[in-house]
Amino acid sequence: MVMIMNRLQALRKERGFTQIKMQMLTGIDQSAYSKIERGERYLSFEQCRRVALALNTSMDYLAGLTDEKAPYPRAKQ
């Protein structure tokens, strides 16, 4: 949980986003997002997916499974 909290806040600030901007990008209420960053609330799978897309990273990076910030390349359709 600590890994996700730290990475969420660091990436958000690195991108120059406020919690209000994250609300607009993800649909997660600002107060709920704040609690997630403080470790008082967990991200659902769908919320994690939306946050990763908004921050242009992978869910694996947020979870601490990789140190590669770049998202995985999308498959060609």
Segments from the language model and where they lie:
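DNA major-groove recognition helix of helix-turn-helix/homeodomain DNA-binding modules
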Residues: 27, 46-61
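Residue-level signal for the short linker/turn that defines the boundary of a DNA-recognition helix
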Residues: 6, 16-17, 43-46
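Short alpha-helical DNA-recognition segment
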Residues: 16-35
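A short, Lys/Arg-rich alpha-helix, primarily the initiator
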Residues: 1-14
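The alpha-helix within a helix-turn-helix
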Residues: 12, 23, 52
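Residues within the helices of the helix-turn-helix
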Residues: 9, 20, 49
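Short, charged recognition helix plus adjacent turn
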Residues: 14, 53, 63-77
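DNA major-groove recognition helix of helix-turn-helix
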Residues: 37, 47, 66
